[in-house]
Amino acid sequence: MTEAMKITLSTQPADARWGEKATYSINNDGITLHLNGADDLGLIQRAARKIDGLGIKHVQLSGEDWDADRCWAFWQGYKAPKGTRKVEWPDLDDAQRQELDNRLMIIDWVRDTINAPAEELGPSQLAQRAVDLISNVAGDRVTYRITKGEDLRDQGYMGLHTVGRGSERSPVLLALDYNPTGDKEAPVYACLVGKGITFDSGGYSIKQTAFMDSMKSDMGGAATVTGALAFAITRGLNKRVKLFLCCADNLISGNAFKLGDIITYRNGKKVEVMNTDAEGRLVLADGLIDASAQKPELIIDAATLTGAAKTALGNDYHALFSFDDALAARLLASASQENEPFWRLPLAEFHRSQLPSNFAELNNTGSAAYPAGASTAAGFLSHFVENYQQGWLHIDCSATYRKAPVEQWSAGATGLGVRTIANLLTA
């Protein structure tokens, strides 16, 4: 077995020979990371990415300066989808080691699930993986129901059925109930709704190759809220929470939905389809209707929903939308506590009316006259939240996945957002 490369931390600057701004240096004992107090976690993560790039696949985090957050920052940068890596962790107290172990188990699950090829991860497989993860941490405190295929149509889940019917792999709705009280009549504190498009070709509004090649990751919202619930449970979540995952492929076939089709939802809303590549909101609508029916204090939906959010924020921040200023502030406070990047974008009442249709109440996409695509998408979703002005958060997951490596991340999924949502649930 290869001897581990020892990684230590220092608050002293590197020797001048390494350069004025050197963040790490190498000596006979191993590698030293030089912290400057400005962005130590970011520095550690970027250094870990460089260490991996050197081909070093076995490391030992050594010394007393490591804590759970610093270990986690290292792992976020060190982990990559190809190859194997081994880390010998430092001695941590029991609470910190448990926190680190839970992050490794759950957030790595999120990253690995998002990175999985669409051939291996269809709608049914995604739903079952979510059940397995939650059951592993919740035991008998969880029950669930899986509805698929024509049963969705028969039960009125017309958005999910319409989008998913073009694939040989049936669309699936997972409804999972985490109820630690044991009381079947206990109120539901929160509902989490996730977009689980396991591959998005764009449908008849087909994507170009450059925009389709990462669309195995279009189920990132579903993976994120699943991970968030699991992580909140490990942190002692003692309130009832329901999870709704809307899982489907968006493909082209003789049975696929078409431009001009009209979908009638269970809440009476009629939606004209004018872009089959704006399918995420169509499946989320069904989940939000179910979530609203639970009368929870809090509804959070998460989706890799729009390119507009990425245009605004890149892949560095998740976009947050809400009519509830106090709730948005709470989530941003949770994000700050967990050192995860969220940024609030505008959502106003007028965005709800910027989806006009000549044949239905709503269009599933905005026109050139209304170019605020991320905000109008959130406005669309609000039509399916019963009390949309209070207790509802929409997360457009622009920081879920990276097509190419950068200085702090490998290519692929990041797992960002899991800890923030879990923090909010357990606050």
Swiss-Prot record:
Parts of the chain that traverse the membrane: none
Subcellular location(s) per record: Cytoplasm
Lineage of origin: Bacteria, Pseudomonadati, Pseudomonadota, Gammaproteobacteria, Enterobacterales
Molecular function GO labels: manganese ion binding; metalloaminopeptidase activity
Cofactor binding description: Binds 2 manganese ions per subunit.
UniProt-listed PANTHER family: LEUCINE AMINOPEPTIDASE-RELATED (PTHR11963), PEPTIDASE B (PTHR11963:SF20)
Binding of Mn(2+) 1, residues: 200, 277, 279
InterPro entries: Leucine_aapep/pepB, M17_PepB-like_N, Pept_M17_PepB, Peptidase_M17_C
HAMAP family in UniProt: Aminopeptidase_M17 (MF_00504)
One GO term (biological process): proteolysis
Keyword Transferase: no
A GO CC annotation given for this chain: cytoplasm
Binding site for Mn(2+) 2: 195, 200, 218, 279
Known EC number: 3.4.11.23
Function: Probably plays an important role in intracellular peptide degradation.
Keyword set includes Magnesium: no
Superkingdom as given in the UniProt entry: Bacteria
Coiled-coil blocks: none
Assembly and oligomerization: Homohexamer.
CDD domains: Peptidase_M17
PROSITE patterns: CYTOSOL_AP
Catalytic activity: Release of an N-terminal amino acid, Xaa, from a peptide or arylamide. Xaa is preferably Glu or Asp but may be other amino acids, including Leu, Met, His, Cys and Gln
Cofactor requirements of the protein: Mn(2+)
Annotated protein name in UniProt: Peptidase B
UniProt keywords, alphabetically: Aminopeptidase, Cytoplasm, Hydrolase, Manganese, Metal-binding, Protease
Native source organism of the sequence: Escherichia coli O7:K1 (strain IAI39 / ExPEC)
